[in-house]
Amino acid sequence: MKAMILAAGKGERMRPLTLHTPKPLVPVAGQPLIEYHLRALAAAGVTEVVINHAWLGQQIEDHLGDGSRFGLSIRYSPEGEPLETGGGIFKALPLLGDAPFLLVNGDVWTDYDFARLQAPLQGLAHLVLVDNPGHHGRGDFRLVGEQVVDGDDAPGTLTFSGISVLHPALFEGCQAGAFKLAPLLRQAMAAGKVSGEHYRGHWVDVGTLERLAEAESLIGERA
């Protein structure tokens, strides 16, 4: 299974760290954030990774190269202007092929074992959901058995971790340009084609300096 890491965000909430460094290369406990994903993907048996980028993206290519030092083959999907999640994935589909692929947001840190996602995909998407963090109390979706449905205001919603397996058919009918992933997922949910799981391990959306410190604390505990 191929994997894609979303790495095109500007990281504006992490300034000044991201003024001259793309967020995926910001050090977390002494290691660029994106390298945690690359090492975990390689450990899970992934061999081919696609990374999209926009803001200071050449730095990402220069730092990671062809991926061989991680035991991976890395290809890049540069974006002149950020295409948001859906548009960025759609642009990279020719590099990802026709089979389901693993997707992970480049700005999260987690101890999730990506090998758990190697099982055959049933439907169009499989989402890893986590408990709602304090900064996202309403959550995103709801897990009913093994099916994911859209969230609501009632208790019991969960947050999309940014980790998933997607089938390229999810993007049928899409056009090139900037668009979000969430509407496509909700459309597939309405058709009963999105499965999911609730992960209760460590997961941090490293989107602010405070949450960067939280991730570093968790990594320190594991050392």
Swiss-Prot record:
> Which cofactor is recorded for it?
Mg(2+)
Disruption outcome: Cells lacking this gene accumulate MurNAc phosphate. Deletion of this gene increases fosfomycin sensitivity.
Enzyme Commission numbers on file: 2.7.7.99
Annotated residues for binding of Mg(2+): 107, 205
Q: Which UniProt keywords apply?
A: Antibiotic resistance, Carbohydrate metabolism, Cell shape, Cell wall biogenesis/degradation, Magnesium, Metal-binding, Nucleotidyltransferase, Peptidoglycan synthesis, Transferase
Q: Does the keyword Cell wall biogenesis/degradation apply?
A: yes
**How does this polypeptide assemble, per the annotation?**
Monomer.
Q: What is the official name of this protein in its record?
A: N-acetylmuramate alpha-1-phosphate uridylyltransferase
Q: Where does this protein come from, organism-wise?
A: Pseudomonas putida (strain ATCC 47054 / DSM 6125 / CFBP 8728 / NCIMB 11950 / KT2440)
Q: Could you tell me the gene encoding this protein?
A: murU
